[in-house]
Amino acid sequence: MFENQLEIQRIQKADELRNLGVNPYPHFLKKDMNIKEFREKFAYIAENETKKADEEIVISGRIKLKRVAGRSTFANIEDESGNVQIYYSKDSIGEENYLKFKKNIEVGDIILVKGYAFLTGTGEFSIHVSDLILASKAISILPEKFHGLADKELRYRQRYLDMIMDPSVRVDFEKRSLIVRTIRRFFEDRGFLEVETPMMHQIAGGANAKPFITHHNALDIDRYLKIAPELYLKRLVVGGMNSVFEMNRCFRNEGMDLTHNPEFTSIEFYWAWHNYFEAMDLTEELFNELLKTLNLGEILDYGNLKIDFSKKFQRIKYLDALVLIGEISPEIIKDKDEILKKLKSDGFEANEKLDLGHLQAELFDNYVESKLINPTFITDFPVSISPLSRRSDKDPEIAERFELYIAGKELANAFNELNDPLDQYERFKAQIEAKKAGDDEAHEMDEDYVRALSYAMPPTVGWGLGVDRLVMILLNKASIRDVILFPAMKPIKNLDDKE
């Protein structure tokens, strides 16, 4: 594996250290504080131009730069909180140790140093080292500092190296963690109970998507990795959990692009005795909380877009959006043949087997979605593309449903839940027919879920949001791979060849 000549040399140096009685991978090492805390504690030295501190402390870091000047060495070390310059010499750590480490400690190594804060002759805040311990010897060579990792694919494959070379990457994922904590706290503060539902399902349900299939050896049956937790969460509402949510991983065996990864994080909540209008209000509250927590202000940059969060989110009905935003004639959107004609004339694929609702969805995807820049709720979807949604009392062909769009991306989907078991059963049967007609993502029949509904579920609104896409918007990232620590990648035979 380690065939690079420079790596071989580093392995030899590790062996040389062992021969000198130095373990290149010691354990039970402790530090007093991180670099940020060290800088804060001794900031008075730089502020008052004091030459040095009286107190010695122990800190650690990875060597990012090293410069030897005769009997002394300057280096820059970095940890999770920041970086600082260190200085050591033959006089400060002893000639034997100095000569030992001068040759065998290099850029990339992690070291533990003991010393005091001081200002160099040029006024640079530094640590005057009195003792140095090698904490972990690096065998692989870091990329050259000023070029870093130019290959994006390598950054995703070797996220650890990406974070070493670019501390802002680590900061982004710390912000992602803050976003997740804020979401969780937001719902807990409003009385929602967090639960965990199965990751392996007997029936791939809760969303229209292609599942990953695995096999349970003990039961000798195929299982599907979770595409959505919806049907299990609604079973809990039937059982009396009236405000429930889950934030977890879901899996969909579909294509990968800038906004899709086969393994992703979503949050879903189910809220009995509330409706989709109240869910829209709650969604706006959540975004306001996130913007406040991240100190982002009301106008967000996203690529070359400006997203305005200063106003209430726009609300527009699905069919109205086709006319007003998609600029499609009202006569076309209600006629299946006219929709097919328009799609084909504009160069889009059109499946003649699709019903009117699914063809309207083709219009929406091609003519409307990308134009929804500022936060917009699209409401009242066709029932045929909403198999789990409650029908509108005013129009049985319309579902009481909304989706939230920002920057041309769908972020959230919600609806008043269908709680009529007979209607749900018929919808499942219609989905089976859709699958026969070529819809690979049509919902399967789930008789146990219908049975659960037959015990009566109170009026409930359900809501789901893609956490990864949300993080993309909040952190101004163009690719979902930039907000997932280890995104899905096509395997390569030899990582060294890629490097």
Curated annotation (Swiss-Prot):
Binds 3 Mg(2+) ions per subunit. One of its GO terms (molecular function) is ATP binding. Mg(2+) 2 binds at residue 410. It is found in: Cytoplasm. Gene3D superfamilies: Bira Bifunctional Protein, Domain 2, Nucleic acid-binding proteins. Pfam families: tRNA-synt_2 (PF00152), tRNA_anti-codon (PF01336). Its EC number is 6.1.1.6. SUPFAM superfamilies: Class II aaRS and biotin synthetases (SSF55681), Nucleic acid-binding proteins (SSF50249). It catalyses: tRNA(Lys) + L-lysine + ATP = L-lysyl-tRNA(Lys) + AMP + diphosphate. Mg(2+) 1 binds at residues 403, 410. Keywords: Aminoacyl-tRNA synthetase, ATP-binding, Cytoplasm, Ligase, Magnesium, Metal-binding, Nucleotide-binding, Protein biosynthesis. One of its GO terms (biological process) is lysyl-tRNA aminoacylation. One of its GO terms (cellular component) is cytosol. Belongs to the class-II aminoacyl-tRNA synthetase family. HAMAP family: Lys_tRNA_synth_class2 (MF_00252). This is Lysine--tRNA ligase.
